[in-house]
């Protein structure tokens, strides 16, 4: 990749793809991005997942945000993302807590009130 590709994450944030690697053995794309959100909070996992899925052309449920690192006071975050080709491959390699993180599913505590 000779030129960094730009992705619009939200109204106040955009990202640059630093590294995009296709892991054909596992059947996933491994992406490292740098998100610029100066003067605003770190974008949510849902916003980043939505932006990456439209950029890659994959379903949102096949995108897993492995981690987001933001330096204190900095308006720049680094994120590591995996995009899988199939749901069953995703379930073999990614822990459930990462797959579910950032989703708006009700937990047992919220349901019982």
From Swiss-Prot:
Swiss-Prot/TrEMBL keywords: Ribonucleoprotein, Ribosomal protein
SUPFAM superfamilies for this protein: Ribosomal proteins S24e, L23 and L15e
Gene Ontology terms for molecular function: structural constituent of ribosome
Domain of life, source organism: Archaea
Cellular-component GO terms for this entry: ribonucleoprotein complex; ribosome
Pfam families on file: Ribosomal_S24e
GO biological process: translation
Keyword 4Fe-4S: no
Assigned protein family: Belongs to the eukaryotic ribosomal protein eS24 family.
Protein name: Small ribosomal subunit protein eS24
Organism encoding this protein: Metallosphaera sedula (strain ATCC 51363 / DSM 5348 / JCM 9185 / NBRC 15509 / TH2)
């Amino acid at each position: 990749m000779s030129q960094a590709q730009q992705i619009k994450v939200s109204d106040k944030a955009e990202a640059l793809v630093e590294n995009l690697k296709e892991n054909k053995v596992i059947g996933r794309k491994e992406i490292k991005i740098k998100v610029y959100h100066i003067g605003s909070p770190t974008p949510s996992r849902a916003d980043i997942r939505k932006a990456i899925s439209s950029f890659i052309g994959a379903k949102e449920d096949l995108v897993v945000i492995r981690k987001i690192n933001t330096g204190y006071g900095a308006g720049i975050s680094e994120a590591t993302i995996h995009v899988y080709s199939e749901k069953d491959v995703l379930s073999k390699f990614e822990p459930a807590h990462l797959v579910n993180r950032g989703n708006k599913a009700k937990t047992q505590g919220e349901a019982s009130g």
